[in-house]
Each structure stands twice: as C-alpha cells, then as structure tokens.
C-alpha cells in the first residue's frame, strides 16, 4: 500500500512532536534521575564529614576515628569512644526485661562507653522501643543492618550517642509494660508512638548515614529540651511527617534547642516536616530537597531557621512550589514576620520559592556558633551523592 505525500508529512510531524515531548520530559526530570543512578566508581569522600574517615581502606581497624568527624551542633558527640567494642551476634529481641548477651538491646543498656558493631548482616525486629544509654555508638558499617517491622530507637535522658549506617524502616507502635532501661533499672513504660528515632531530653547526638522510610509517626523527633544534635548524610523516603523538632508550642524547654541538618537527601514520596521546628535554632546546610507535597520546611513559636546552600526542586504540581510553611500564624502576619527564616545561597528549581522573614542580618552576628560552612548549592548533588547507609566492606575503601 502506498501512502500519499500528505499522509507521510503528517506521520513525520507526529513523530517529531513525540520526540520533542520525550526530550523535554527527560530534561525536566534529569536532576531527579541522576540522583537514583547507582555509582560504581572508586571511593569518593565528597563532603566535610565524610572526608574525615571515608576512603581509607583500613577504616575498620580504627572505627573509633569516626567519633572525631562530627560537625555542626553535634560536634561534641563522642559516642562510645575510648570504650571497648561490643559485637552484636544475635538478632533476636525476645526478652526486653532481661536481654540476652549478644543482642543489640543488651549492648545499648550497659553503663559506660561502648562501641557497638555487628558480626554479620542482620534484620532486627524490636519488640519494644530500644532505649539507648549515654556514651554509645551503634556502628553498622561493613554490614547490612536493618531495624524493621517493629519498634524504633529511643535516646532518652542521654548524651554522647552516635548512630551510623543503619537501614531503619517500617516502624510500628508497640505496647507498654516492663522494660529494661539500663543494666540496673527496670521501668514501667507506656506504649510508644512508632517513631523511627526519638530523641528525648538528650544532648550531643550525631545521626549519620542512615536510610529511613515508613514509620507510623516521625522518622526523627527531638523534644523535651534535646539539643546539640547533628543529622547528616541521611536519605529519607516514603513518609508523611519526616522530622519534628519541639513537641508543642508550650514546650519552653525547647528554646535552647540547636540542630544541624547537613548533606541529607529528602527523596521520593515525602510530604512535610523536613523539618518542622519550634523555638530553637536550626541550621540547614547543603541538603537536597527533591520531593515534597505540603511543604519542606515548617515551624512556629519563633523558631530560627537558617537555610544555606540547599537545593530545592519543586514538584510539577502548580500549588506545590513554596518551601516554607508557618503554622498557627495565618491570622497574624505581624507575628511570623518576626521569626528569622533566612535563605542564603540556596538553589530553587522548577519554580520553587522560599519566603524569608525576620532579621536578615543574623548571619553576621553568629560567628561563635558551631555552623558548618556551606558549599555552593551547585555542588549539592555531589555532596549528597552517598547519603543513606553505605555498602562498606572490610579492608576496602568505604
């Protein structure tokens, strides 16, 4: 069958149109697709924290070097440095009143500094929330360690805690009852809410290279006067309310809260609270925000938020462009205009916007604080390239 000249022209025109739309779609989605491409080249330490320890083939022979690598407000978190090593050999969590030696629960309740590692890759289903005491490091490097399908981690009235290189997901609420809180104290606790990591009345905390998704409540909550916290190199996906810093608008004890978010990737299928802040001081530096629905950064109660060198890529939806959200202040613009929210050197893509407020000269007055110096936002894709739990191998660069 022969086609007419006009038919051939129409077919060619349709093919050309389809090609143009395909090319435009690729261009629009290119930044997101690059983020999901798996890197298979040589080890790269791409940000100020990772450069402290990564890519040394002998990292596993001096694991405690990592305790010197925190930056930001959690810089003094030493974890279990100078303490002995404890190796988790048993992935069970059957007895929360008298935990078995070899389990993770037995390790985290011991007195004194302890550096906790894992004998093999394992999946741990916590039957009750895991109470982590002071001067502990949970170090999952070199193994694939999942905390999943059970309770989450609770850091309560503790200091000097490091949690590194875990995969935490599908966290659910668990019932109350008797629970071993330390090696010499048994407590009666209420039901937990299903947070993946909950920080309560604690200080000097560092959470690094954690992959987190799908908890019943928050992925990371910090409340009740908690402060001096750094959350870095983490990868968050598949969650509604990601982070809550400050329990409520009456929690005056949170006025001194200071938290750093650095080199994190806020990824697919996230909704809001990245973070949601109250009262304190929050430094968000060189993070990659590639997905949000309601908002990315929210707050109330006079929270101070400094956003530096971050990348914000808005969704294609017309009404999902604004990064910020002020809660409980819609009736009083005069109120939230006093809250200091600064954007400095951020990159806004696909129509993303950020509404600043308050003292825009604050950066010149806070040189005394432990702030990570931001790198250009054009480098954020590289700085966060290895966010989440790493696939480290012993005697190889990590």
Curated annotation (Swiss-Prot):
The active site is at residue 273. Its cofactor is Ca(2+). It catalyses: Eliminative cleavage of (1->4)-alpha-D-galacturonan to give oligosaccharides with 4-deoxy-alpha-D-galact-4-enuronosyl groups at their non-reducing ends. Its EC number is 4.2.2.2. Ca(2+) binds at residues 192, 217, 221. Pfam families: Pectate_lyase_4. InterPro entries: AmbAllergen, Pec_lyase, Pectin_lyas_fold, Pectin_lyase_fold/virulence, PEL. One of its GO terms (biological process) is pectin catabolic process. Expressed in anthers and pollen. SMART domains: Amb_all (SM00656). It is an enzyme of class 4 (lyase). Binds 1 Ca(2+) ion. Required for its activity. Glycans are attached at residues 135, 228. GO terms for molecular function: metal ion binding; pectate lyase activity. Pathway: Glycan metabolism; pectin degradation; 2-dehydro-3-deoxy-D-gluconate from pectin: step 2/5. Residues 1-27 form the signal peptide. Belongs to the polysaccharide lyase 1 family. This is Probable pectate lyase P56. It comes from Solanum lycopersicum (Tomato). The gene is LAT56.
